[in-house]
Amino acid sequence: VYPLSLRETTDTAAWDARLPASPQATVFSSSAFLRATGCRLRLFEVLRGQQVVALLPLTEDDSGQRVLPPPYTPYLGPLCLHEPGLPNRERVLDEFLLGEMLAAELATRYREVRLPLSWQYTDVRPFLWHNYHAAGASRYASSPRYTAVLPLAGLDAETYPARVRACRRQERRKAAALRLHDDIDIDDFLRLYALTFERQDLAVDAGQLACVRRITEAAVGGGWGRLAGCSTPQGLASATLFVRDHARAYYLFGASDPAQRNSGAATRLIFDNVFDALNRGLLEVDFVGVNSPARGDFKLSFDPQLRLYFELHHVAY
């Protein structure tokens, strides 16, 4: 049995080509998305001998001594690449050995590590057991997080609304005459985005807006994102950016005009994005985080299923 090792790669084409084979891979693992965040990016392959068995995308701070999650990135790595048909007992063991190696390697290389895991990466034992028998040694901590995922198998436009909370159905009917469109000006979208946070007494600085712009432009220009809006006679009332990969669509950004919050536009736009994902043949819609009360409740009202994931944190002593 060959030991596991890390090898850095700059071949983004090969990297992206491998992503569909990993259950943990998402659009947030793609080189295009990670470049758009503007972070210092390093891409690693995990080798067993000469075979690539996993991928590990990392983003570092300017010092190169800390691994920090990029902005607007709920999940990252590791990304397992199992052989098709691998028995479950071998898959569990392979993932454990991978986690064990990465826990030790990252703790040695970096002063601090913050790593958000996919909700499909379920075995965090190797990280939690790092230095298990070493009294006083540094340990990994894990923070539970939740997202909400709507399976699209068997879903259709006729029956889905009945599954959604009654108030959302009412808002959809209220907004039935409003105009849905994809010809959104990014400046208009960013204006609404800033207003959405201002209404909650939250500031969005210029750096954050610049990052949202880069991601939005990359997604729309690269064909892996949809910037859509819903307008009233008074103008753009709500806008969303859904990004997508080979399997699912992700509700990444949402923005609404505070003066038109009661128009039902935001709700109608969510329905439209769900049906768009269905028409594209995608498997799921990920609502990307239900980790605050009001926003989480809005997303859960569309009948997705809760999914638990973890963010790992390690600080070297």
Predicted regions mapped to residue ranges:
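Residue-level preference for alpha-helix termini and adjacent loops
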Residues: 27, 32-33, 78, 159, ...
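Conserved catalytic-core motifs of GNAT/GCN5-like acyltransferases
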Residues: 142-147, 305-317
